Regions:
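Terminal alpha-helical segments
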Residues: 1-124
Length: 124
């Protein structure tokens, strides 16, 4: 049962990440950075949650993306190579979109982190 759930999370995360990438490929003046940011943050959560499920941890028992990420660090310390704390919007409760979704450059950073986490999860 969890395998299907994990596969669905990865599939949904990939679709959302692809949409964010497509948005960023538009001319910069046409990019809706808030849309990219929100989609990418949901992607981060999906991939992190999929990793936890792969490791028999129910992500719903953890209150935030940060708590889930920190649990990933306990399971696999190499997650520290992917530093989601560098995102200005992250705090102990998760993402505050109003603090971050202002420029294409910043949402591009978030997209890169989501890609790195996807790679880590798929390869694990």
């Amino acid at each position: 049962m969890n395998d299907k759930r994990i596969d669905q999370m990865i599939y949904d995360g990939n679709k959302m990440l692809q949409r964010a990438m497509e948005e960023l490929n538009r001319p910069e003046e046409d990019v809706v950075s808030l849309s990219v940011c929100k989609g990418t943050k949901m992607t981060l959560d999906l991939f992190i949650s999929a990793f936890l499920l792969k490791n028999n941890v129910d992500p719903n028992t953890l209150d935030s993306v940060i708590e889930r990420y920190e649990k990933c660090l306990v399971i696999d310390p190499t997650f520290d190579k992917i530093d989601i704390y560098q995102l200005d919007c992250m705090d102990e409760k998760g993402c505050d979109a109003s603090r971050y979704c202002l420029s294409v450059e910043k949402v591009n950073d978030c997209l890169k982190i989501a890609e790195d986490i996807r790679t880590k999860v798929v390869m694990s």
